Curated annotation (Swiss-Prot):
GO molecular function, one term: damaged DNA binding
Signal peptide feature range: none
Keywords: ATP-binding, DNA damage, DNA recombination, DNA-binding, Nucleotide-binding
Family: Belongs to the eukaryotic RecA-like protein family.
PANTHER family named among the record's database cross-references: MEIOTIC RECOMBINATION PROTEIN DMC1_LIM15 HOMOLOG, RECA/RAD51/RADA DNA STRAND-PAIRING FAMILY MEMBER
Phylogenetic lineage: Archaea, Nanobdellota, Candidatus Nanoarchaeia, Nanoarchaeales, Nanoarchaeaceae
Disulfide cysteine pairs (residue numbers): none
Amino-acid positions noted as binding ATP in the UniProt annotation, renumbered to this chain: 114-121
Naturally occurring in which organism (per UniProt): Nanoarchaeum equitans (strain Kin4-M)
Stated name of the protein: DNA repair and recombination protein RadA
Name of the gene this protein is made from: radA
């Protein structure tokens, strides 16, 4: 975990061994304009971006890592100290916050998956409002980026939720940056644009991607394209995780489900999240949502680095996400 306070200058790149003026120009134009971006790139990505050989790409990446101290081991005590810099954003449901260990964690990727109407998008809207609250109310006094792949973002809902929390609705709307994306390349570019906002000094503390996998499913339909789809999805998730860890930002993504073959039991055992192992291994927290009776939503924590698998309930009201009465 490495939180950056300030953006790296482009001059840092030019001082790396193996990076001449032409290579630097190619790297910068391809988006590799800082040491950390180069350090977190794969050898193949750098080879393609700068049109250089494998040995040169590896040398440049290792030099960037060395400059940033990424090749040094840390004690568990030091890691614990770094983790204490992370924060959490309330969902406005004490039940849901408790399930997640206090809310949506920064420097992590939280995935909510479930069928249509289970509440995934509503949670995303709620978080985009809640992140603006002061820390004593469960927020981070920050702004949100909302990457919308299915056209489900509604500013009217942001306004409604903000008013319920006594926030200035006009200010709340200005604190949410929305981008409607139309294909997977556009989606991946949106994540990089979000990083640019952060590097320019915007206090972005939350990035919502709703939905993470919809466009990938739409573009890569056949079995023959599955490997390509998973590779590209993996790169996108890697970008999101890098942003989360570098800038101490919370990433909230929604995901679709598909029926499990040979399953006849309704609920968790009858569906599985889209994205396969790529997403399963990348998500820090994974929550399955389903509808219960009388408007109740059931949330099950399926995966977490340190929390037990368990269930809780919440409701979606006019005011937003709340606990059942």
């Amino acid at each position: 975990m490495l939180f950056l306070a300030n953006p790296m200058s482009k001059d840092d790149i030019r001082s790396l061994p193996g990076v001449g003026p032409k290579t630097a120009e190619k790297l910068i134009s391809a988006g590799y304009d800082s040491l950390i971006k180069i350090a977190s790139a794969s050898v193949e990505e750098l080879m393609e971006a700068a049109d250089i050989g494998e040995a040169t790409a590896r040398k440049i990446i290792e030099a960037a890592m060395e400059r940033l101290g990424l090749l040094e081991f840390k004690t568990a005590e030091e890691v614990l100290e770094e983790r204490q810099k992370t924060a959490r954003i309330t969902t406005m449901s004490k039940n849901l916050d408790s399930l997640l260990g206090g809310g949506i964690e920064t420097a992590a990727l939280t995935e909510f998956y479930g069928e249509y109407g289970s509440g995934k998008t509503q949670v995303g809207h709620q978080l985009a409002v809640d992140v603006q609250l002061p820390p004593e109310q469960g927020g981070l006094e920050g702004k949100a980026v909302y990457i919308d792949t299915e056209g489900t973002f509604r500013p009217e809902r942001i306004k409604q939720m903000a008013e319920a929390l006594d926030l200035d609705p006009k200010k709340a709307l200005k604190n949410v940056y929305h981008m409607k994306v139309f294909n997977t390349d556009h989606q991946m570019l949106a994540a990089r644009k979000a990083e640019e906002l952060i590097r320019k000094g915007e206090p972005i503390k939350l990035i919502v991607v709703d939905s993470l996998t919809a466009l990938f499913r739409a573009e890569y339909t056949g079995r023959g394209q599955l490997a390509e789809r998973q590779h590209k999805l993996g790169r996108h998730v890697h970008d999101l995780l890098r942003i989360a860890e570098l800038y101490n930002v919370a990433i909230y993504v929604t995901n679709q489900v598909m029926a499990k073959p040979d399953s006849f039991i309704p609920g968790l055992d009858s569906v599985q999240a889209v994205g396969g192992h790529v997403l399963a291994h990348a998500s820090t927290y994974r929550v399955f949502l389903r509808k219960g009776k009388k408007g109740i939503r059931i949330a099950r924590l399926v995966d977490s680095p340190h929390l037990p698998e368990r269930e809780t309930t919440f409701v979606i009201t006019e005011e937003g996400i709340r606990d059942p009465e």
